[in-house]
């Protein structure tokens, strides 16, 4: 099944990330649904976002519960088959989502990931390097957590391990995906600008 604007929700976990999140939200097509999980009790911040942006739902966790809990809360609130986990310190290129939509129709996947426009595959072990320069996607064992698209139907309820506060929660998720025999891909030509670790 192909990812589209109608069956995708973008989930962003923040903690008072006002300085960076607006650049992120401004880079997202306003027609795409967005869920913001603010890991604090600052309702003024989330209200500003709701007042300014379309198709956005904001929730306050009350305190910093970590990335795993925040992402799981966003996934639980989402109503679409696909979710895109996105850090607030990322900026999508103009064609990032379109390239994800196009490539997704030819792949059976649990997780897809665009890459940073500064990346040249330094953190990925490509499983089959044959003709990799000509391919638009590669199967890998894991992807970085700042941007990943998840097919919720490939999971048995459990997504991120809530006992992992941050940094390794995406590695654990990818490991469990591979143990189930599901596939993870990176998309070479779907790129984003990752500014740095400014989420929680």
Model-derived regions: residue spans:
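Short, well-formed alpha-helical segments that are part of the catalytic scaffolds
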Residues: 12-30
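Conserved donor NDP-sugar-binding/catalytic core segment of glycosyltransferases
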Residues: 90-125
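Glycine-rich, basic loop-to-helix element that forms the pyrophosphate-binding segment
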Residues: 60-78
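Short aromatic/hydrophobic "clamp" motif used to bind/position activated sugar donors
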Residues: 83
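Short, flexible, basic/aromatic active-site loop/helix in glycosyltransferases
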Residues: 122-147
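A conserved acidic beta->alpha catalytic loop
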Residues: 27, 36-47
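Short beta-strand/loop segment that forms part of the nucleotide-sugar
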Residues: 32-41, 59-61
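A short, conserved alpha-helix in the catalytic core of glycosyltransferases
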Residues: 145-150, 154-159, 163-191
